[in-house]
């Protein structure tokens, strides 16, 4: 892991092994039995998965020293956001999706109070 010290890598690997063990200790439920029994087993399994997920987040935040959730990105106001399609549109297999469109303003739609 680039830019990290070896000791930090060992701590992170230890945390990942622990999380992997937690998930492996909760295998998917057995598909046998009555519908109600299967439903109850799935419900209990999902609850254990949620608990393992929250424990895993706490382990990672402890070992990494930060939250597992990304910090929210501050965006400018919506009025200032624009889509600029002058820079090589459709390079990732989406030809035609990002083609520029011309906005024709209709006074009947934009001016709700005006009647013709």
Curated annotation (Swiss-Prot):
- Composition bias, kind Basic residues: at what positions? 36-47
User: What GO cellular component term, any one, is given?
Assistant: host cell nucleolus
Leader sequence segment: none
Region ranges (Disordered):
23-49
Keywords of this protein's UniProt record, alphabetized? Answer: AIDS, Host cytoplasm, Host nucleus, Host-virus interaction, Methylation, mRNA transport, Phosphoprotein, RNA-binding, Transport
Tell me, which GO biological process terms does this entry list? mRNA transport; protein localization to nucleoplasm; viral process
Share the domain note from the entry.
Answer: The RNA-binding motif binds to the RRE, a 240 bp stem-and-loop structure present in incompletely spliced viral pre-mRNAs. This region also contains the NLS which mediates nuclear localization via KPNB1 binding and, when the N-terminal sequence is present, nucleolar targeting. These overlapping functions prevent Rev bound to RRE from undesirable return to the nucleus. When Rev binds the RRE, the NLS becomes masked while the NES remains accessible. The leucine-rich NES mediates binding to human XPO1.
| Note from the entry | HIV-1 lineages are divided in three main groups, M (for Major), O (for Outlier), and N (for New, or Non-M, Non-O). The vast majority of strains found worldwide belong to the group M. Group O seems to be endemic to and largely confined to Cameroon and neighboring countries in West Central Africa, where these viruses represent a small minority of HIV-1 strains. The group N is represented by a limited number of isolates from Cameroonian persons. The group M is further subdivided in 9 clades or subtypes (A to D, F to H, J and K).
* Family named by the database record: Belongs to the HIV-1 REV protein family.
Q: Report the locations given in the UniProt record.
A: Host nucleus, Host nucleolus; Host cytoplasm
Q: Which InterPro entries match?
A: REV_protein
Chain location of the short sequence motif Nuclear export signal and binding to XPO1 per the record: 73-84
Oligomer status and interactors? Homomultimer; when bound to the RRE. Multimeric assembly is essential for activity and may involve XPO1. Binds to human KPNB1, XPO1, TNPO1, RANBP5 and IPO7. Interacts with the viral Integrase. Interacts with human KHDRBS1. Interacts with human NAP1; this interaction decreases Rev multimerization and stimulates its activity. Interacts with human DEAD-box helicases DDX3 and DDX24; these interactions may serve for viral RNA export to the cytoplasm and packaging, respectively.
What GO molecular function annotation could you give as one example from this UniProt entry? RNA binding
Question: What is the recorded function of this protein according to its Swiss-Prot or TrEMBL entry?
Answer: Escorts unspliced or incompletely spliced viral pre-mRNAs (late transcripts) out of the nucleus of infected cells. These pre-mRNAs carry a recognition sequence called Rev responsive element (RRE) located in the env gene, that is not present in fully spliced viral mRNAs (early transcripts). This function is essential since most viral proteins are translated from unspliced or partially spliced pre-mRNAs which cannot exit the nucleus by the pathway used by fully processed cellular mRNAs. Rev itself is translated from a fully spliced mRNA that readily exits the nucleus.
Can you summarize the PTM annotation of this record? Asymmetrically arginine dimethylated at one site by host PRMT6. Methylation impairs the RNA-binding activity and export of viral RNA from the nucleus to the cytoplasm.
Q: Does the keyword Phosphoprotein apply?
A: yes
Q: Which residues carry this modification: Phosphoserine?
A: 5, 8, 92, 99
Q: What is this protein called?
A: Protein Rev
Looking at the record, which segments are called Homomultimerization? 18-26
Where is the motif (Nuclear localization signal and RNA-binding (RRE))? 34-50
